[in-house]
A protein has these predicted regions:
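Shared catalytic-loop signature of beta/alpha-barrel
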Residues: 222-228, 232-236, 243-337
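N-terminal amphipathic alpha-helix/helix-capping segment at the start of soluble metabolic enzymes
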Residues: 1-3, 7, 18-23, 110-111, ...
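A cross-domain feature marking catalytic cores of carbohydrate-active enzymes
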Residues: 45, 133-135, 160-162, 188-192, ...
Length: 387
């Protein structure tokens, strides 16, 4: 197989503020695998300060992946090796790269079999689900206005970021969102900003405002404290940063109400399926989340949405210009494509300084704006990359 990669800059439509930082852009690296018949499979990984992945690191890891993938005759054997625990083009300790390699292989395997990914995974029809739409830390007036616009567009689930220095700001923000969109389901995400004492004081107030569940209220690193809080909380508690991989989830199964599975965090589609299987019958339910990424980066998770209680796959909707299309979302619902593979396509962009990206199996080429280099912590600082 032939393997190529491209690095692009993904700019957000507006800066996204969470509890400790603000993000306005990030880099993405696209991996493309090509078979002997000229068909292409694509995967994406994005930079993340929290996971220690800057642009240089991702490019180096993808270069290593290209060398390793070259030893496989076809994507089917590479995917089988990857699912069996072999590196198969991705260092086992870097879940985001493993996820991107797995996505590219699944995309190509699906195209070779003329089958969408969800059918390869056992779902006969294309999964669809309501996705949450994120509202960052902002003034109550702006949050309320945004909630009103989103509800009018069809969004029935809104996720409000919390963790402002003054907790009353969080309460007033949620109050404004609830008043502006009284019928939507509300999720709350402090990104680990609270102490146990603050969480215990605030959660009853958010319950009174009709919040459905709270993600990772406590700082990660003490899953026992999170589990203990979940037992006392008037709201369901969903573990995120404390539920990275399968072993983390097994320790929390039955002790928290949900786990937020992000493919870049756990290692891809098949790792997510193992996590979903591990919590069956435990009382802990699945949430599918994402980093801010393009439709290419989110597409693998969209093929799994029929397995989740909560779906938060709006990362592509936060971009100023999503360079891929094919999973929907603008009306509040994401839907897996029925086209072979991941089912996403490059949007036709043209302009100065753009880099060619191998396109669909018909041999056409798409383009993507070339990145200016690593973010270097300038725009992606602190923990904004958890959004």
């Amino acid at each position: 197989m032939k393997v190529t990669r491209r690095t692009v800059r993904l700019a957000l439509a507006e800066p996204l503020r969470i509890s400790r930082s603000t993000m306005s852009a990030r880099d993405a690296v696209w991996l493309t695998v090509e078979d002997d018949d000229g068909r292409h499979g694509h995967g994406e990984a994005v930079t993340s300060v929290y996971y220690g992945l800057d642009t240089d690191t991702l490019e180096r890891l993808f270069a290593d992946a290209a060398v390793d993938l070259a030893r496989f005759r076809d994507p089917e054997s590479a995917l089988e090796a990857l699912c069996g625990g072999e590196p198969a083009g991705a260092p086992a300790t870097v879940p985001a790269v493993t996820a991107a390699v797995g996505a590219a292989l699944l995309d190509l395997v699906g195209k070779r079999a003329d089958s969408p990914v969800h059918r390869l995974l056992g779902a006969p029809s294309a999964p669809t689900a309501a996705t949450a739409r994120t509202i960052g830390i902002t003034s109550p007036a702006r949050a309320g206005a945004k909630a009103r616009r989103l509800a009018a567009r069809g969004f029935g689930v809104l996720k409000v970021k919390a963790g402002a220095p003054d907790p009353e700001e969080d309460v007033e923000r949620v109050r404004a969102v609830r008043a502006a969109a009284p019928r939507v389901r509300l999720l709350l995400d402090p990104n680990g900003a609270w102490t146990t004492a603050r969480a215990e004081a605030l959660l009853p107030r958010f319950a009174d405002l009709g919040v459905e569940a709270v993600e990772q209220p406590l700082a990660p690193g003490d899953p026992e404290a999170l589990a203990a809080l979940a037992q006392r909380s008037p709201l369901p508690v969903i573990a995120d940063e404390d539920a990275v991989g399968l072993e983390d989830v097994r320790r929390l199964a039955g002790r928290v109400h949900g786990v937020n599975v992000k493919l870049a965090k756990c290692g891809g589609v098949h790792a997510a399926l193992r996590i979903a299987e591990s919590i069956e019958g435990s009382g802990t339910e699945l949430m599918l989340g994402c980093l801010t990424a393009s439709s290419l980066g989110l597409a693998p998770a969209v093929h799994l949405v029929d397995r989740a209680r909560w779906v938060d796959l709006d990362g592509h909707l936060l971009l100023a210009a999503d360079p891929w299309t094919g999973i929907g979302g603008t009306d509040g619902y994401v839907t897996a494509s029925g086209r072979p593979g991941l089912g996403v396509r490059r949007r036709p962009y043209a302009g100065h300084g753009e880099a060619e990206v191998p396109g669909e199996e018909n041999g056409t080429l798409g383009t993507a704006a070339a990145a200016n280099g690593p973010l270097g912590g300038r725009e992606e600082t602190g923990r904004a990359d958890l959004a």
